[in-house]
């Protein structure tokens, strides 16, 4: 009698070929086993002490990669030179990169892997990079570094808003809290700061509930991390990050990879951002979108601003959360101190 065969979603082409050879499943017609997926997710979401120790090693080297960038960035060099200095730290520790380095003066373009630009005075470089240990465990951090010794006053105003959102999210981490609530909190803090500067108007939380915050934060707040930097991404966010519950389809909110209640043993990133995306500004203004919340006249004066993100890695504990690895400079004065 034929028995059902359980298999996971295929992620690589060679696995699709094997599935076809073994079971006759044509690529694109796969029907992965949800019970199998949930079994793997429920095993890998909870990190053992041995796994935490390995991730900690990755995060320590990842921190050193970011410290190297903070000492390297300056006007007159290319983004590629910063990326090379960052990669050197990982390779010197006999580690791999956990994902291709993002080192860009165009921080408003998410997941931008081009490194061809020359860094100029007045720029900021957004670095998103991590190390992967010999056992395959990942680190993942982001930094935003001024090209000059200090942030300009214009940069500092926005940077401090991002840091406030980051610190508010970290302070909220604890078992039992839905991560979507942490996301909304960080977005609310960003809207409060931007309202003080005249970019948005109205109640900050209403701005978030309406979805207008996605002009400035069209992405999520963080993701699970482990053997994959976006852990088990190929198994499906609805299972990994939402425990089988439906995700939002709203622009911005739909990019939140993690929304479920946090539990001890989870390892995740915290990475709110504040982005000024010219193409999105043009689109929404042409659609008269969220005019009750967004001050487009003010916003358009920041079309050339770029974007800001800082990111750290945390373990959810029995009573709260613990930073993994060593602390890197995040507050503006900390970054500027290492830039001197």
Where are the language model's segments positioned?
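Active-site neighborhoods and metal-handling regions in enzymes and metal-associated proteins
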Residues: 1-340
């Amino acid at each position: 009698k034929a028995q059902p065969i359980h298999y996971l979603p295929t992620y690589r082409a060679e696995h699709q070929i094997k599935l076809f050879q073994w079971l006759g499943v044509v690529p694109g017609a796969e029907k992965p086993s949800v019970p199998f997926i949930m079994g793997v997710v429920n095993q890998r979401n909870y990190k053992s002490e041995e796994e935490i120790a390995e991730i900690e090693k990755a995060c320590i080297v990842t921190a050193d990669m970011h410290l190297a960038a903070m000492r390297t960035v300056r006007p007159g060099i290319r983004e590629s030179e910063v990326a090379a200095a960052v990669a050197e730290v990982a390779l010197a520790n006999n580690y791999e990169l956990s994902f291709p380095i993002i080192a860009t003066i165009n921080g408003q373009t998410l997941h931008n892997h081009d490194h061809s630009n020359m860094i100029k005075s007045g720029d900021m470089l957004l670095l998103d990079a991590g190390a992967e240990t010999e056992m395959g465990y990942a680190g993942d951090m982001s930094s935003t570094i001024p090209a000059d010794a200090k942030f300009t006053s214009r940069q500092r105003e926005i940077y401090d808003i991002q840091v406030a959102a980051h610190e508010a999210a970290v302070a909220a981490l604890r078992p039992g809290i839905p991560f979507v609530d942490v996301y909304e909190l960080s977005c609310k803090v960003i809207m409060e700061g931007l309202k003080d500067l005249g970019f948005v108007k109205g109640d900050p939380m209403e701005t978030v509930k309406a979805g207008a915050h996605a002009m400035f934060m069209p992405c999520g707040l963080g993701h699970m991390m482990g053997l994959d930097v976006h852990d088990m991404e190929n198994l499906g966010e609805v299972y990994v990050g939402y425990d089988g519950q439906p995700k939002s389809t709203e622009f911005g909110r739909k990019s939140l990879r993690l929304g479920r209640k946090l539990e001890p043993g989870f390892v995740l990133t915290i990475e709110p951002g504040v982005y000024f995306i010219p193409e999105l500004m043009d689109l929404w203004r042409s659609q008269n979108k969220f005019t009750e919340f967004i001050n487009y006249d003010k916003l358009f004066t920041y079309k050339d601003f770029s974007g800001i993100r800082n990111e750290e890695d945390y373990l959810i504990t029995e009573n709260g959360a613990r930073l993994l690895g060593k602390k890197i400079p995040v507050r503006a004065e900390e970054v500027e101190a290492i830039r001197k």
